[in-house]
Amino acid sequence: MDYQRLLFLFAVAMVITTTVALPQDTALMDGQLQKRGTPCKCLGYTGVYWFMITRCPNGHGYNLSCPYFLGVCCVKK
């Protein structure tokens, strides 16, 4: 019984610590967070490497793509 209570208190303390430690950034909350990818080369152009997908994602303005190691390199020309 004591171990269960101790484990419960430890879990509550971890949740409180994690909640307090998270940044309260307004840009993060407004959805303005910008994701950055790894640069890659595609037909002489520098693009963004997307891991574990076969096509460039829609809505990002990519108009050139090359297959890359376990993913795709997407370029905005």
Curated annotation (Swiss-Prot):
Propeptide: 22-34
Comment field (misc): A synonymy between H.magnifica and R.crispa is controversial.
Its biological purpose: Toxin that inhibits rat ASIC3 channels (IC(50)=13.8 uM). Also able to bind T.californica muscle-type nicotinic acetylcholine receptors (nAChR), and human alpha-7/CHRNA7 nicotinic acetylcholine receptors.
Location(s), subcellular: Secreted; Nematocyst
Name of a matching Pfam family: Defensin_4
Keywords: Acetylcholine receptor inhibiting toxin, Cleavage on pair of basic residues, Disulfide bond, Ion channel impairing toxin, Nematocyst, Neurotoxin, Postsynaptic neurotoxin, Proton-gated sodium channel impairing toxin, Secreted, Signal, Toxin
Protein name (record): Pi-stichotoxin-Hmg5a
Record InterPro entries: BDS_K_chnl_tox, Myo_ane_neurotoxin_sf
Top-rank taxon: Eukaryota
Cysteine pairings via disulfide bonds: C40-C73, C42-C66, C56-C74
Signal peptide span: 1-21
Family membership noted in the UniProt record: Belongs to the sea anemone type 3 (BDS) potassium channel toxin family.
